């Protein structure tokens, strides 16, 4: 009875792809952080100019 053995890869041979993916993920995270900071800065500017109108725009009229 002959038995055949097959060797399965454990997925450890593609370190270069993992590094590329990690770098891309870090770049995306930095971009999202910058976009979030820009949005928060824009909101701060609006609030500094006219906070009353900003709040009034988001408060429902008539207590509803």
Curated annotation (Swiss-Prot):
InterPro entries listed in its UniProt record: Ubiquitin-like_Pup
Gene Ontology molecular-function annotations: proteasome binding; protein tag activity
Description of its domains: The N-terminal unstructured half of Pup provides a signal required to initiate unfolding and degradation by the proteasome but is not needed for pupylation, while the C-terminal helical half of Pup interacts with ARC to target proteins to the proteasome.
Coiled coil: 26-52
Stretch list, region Disordered: 1-36
Protein name: Prokaryotic ubiquitin-like protein Pup
Deamidated glutamine sites (modified residues): 64
UniProt cross-references to NCBIfam families, sorted A to Z: pupylate_cterm
Annotated keywords: Coiled coil, Isopeptide bond, Ubl conjugation pathway
Keyword Nucleotide-binding: no
Description of how the protein assembles with itself and partners: Strongly interacts with the proteasome-associated ATPase ARC through a hydrophobic interface; the interacting region of Pup lies in its C-terminal half. There is one Pup binding site per ARC hexamer ring.
Protein task: Protein modifier that is covalently attached to lysine residues of substrate proteins, thereby targeting them for proteasomal degradation. The tagging system is termed pupylation.
Pathway(s) served: Protein degradation; proteasomal Pup-dependent pathway
Segments for region (ARC ATPase binding): 21-58
Pfam family, one: Pup
Recorded family membership: Belongs to the prokaryotic ubiquitin-like protein family.
A biological-process GO annotation: proteasomal protein catabolic process
Cross-link (Isoglutamyl lysine isopeptide (Gln-Lys) (interchain with K-? in acceptor proteins)): 64
Post-translational modification: Is modified by deamidation of its C-terminal glutamine to glutamate by the deamidase Dop, a prerequisite to the subsequent pupylation process.
Keyword Coiled coil: yes
């Amino acid at each position: 009875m002959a038995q055949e053995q097959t060797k399965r890869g454990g997925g450890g041979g593609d370190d270069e792809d993992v590094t590329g993916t990690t770098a891309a993920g870090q770049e995306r995270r930095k971009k999202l952080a910058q976009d979030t900071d820009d949005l928060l800065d824009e909101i701060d500017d609006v609030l500094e100019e006219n906070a009353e109108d900003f709040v009034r725009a988001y408060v429902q009229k008539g207590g509803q």
